[in-house]
Amino acid sequence: MIRRVLENVATAGVIGAAGDTLMQVREGVTLASQLDTGRTARLVSFRMCHAPVVDAAWRFFDARIPFKGIPGVLARVFADQGFLMPPSITLFFVSQSVMEGCTLGESLFRAKDGFVPAALKCLPFWCTVHCVTFGIVAPRYRMAWASLCAVAWNAIISGENQEAIRRELALRELADANLQGRESEV
């Protein structure tokens, strides 16, 4: 059991680093020295903590969802997206924001702001992936399979986090401009 947890943690961490690096290259980073290693470390930290929880939930679904064949696959996909996706996305945004030095209030705002755009991308992506996860892949290899697919997902969710940061900065600039305008009126 401990070996399985360690394998899942290592797999998710390595592949999380690859996904974030891919996103940074997509965003225009051309030299290794330009990579935001702190950003990558934050994403890897989340993925390494998240993987064992997801694996335990999948084992629970296997034990508790009695359906076989296509109905069983669909039930597990819906369970994954219904029970794991909402807290996973929320915790992703909160954890990234807190590790960036934001307050809990700012972190919760980011989670609220980023949840819907991320969920709208998450559902079609992971529902498709998990039809394979729960329909074809042996339970022992599910985390490796999902982690490989997560290369693309990590790039997407990392990009969503960067968009949320940009929206936060724009709101702060607007608030500062409004405050300065009010001060000049006094």
Region annotations inferred by a language model:
Residues 1, 166-186:
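Transit-peptide-like, low-complexity N-terminal presequences
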Residues 2-29, 34-102, 111-166:
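Alpha-helical transmembrane segments of eukaryotic organelle membrane transporters
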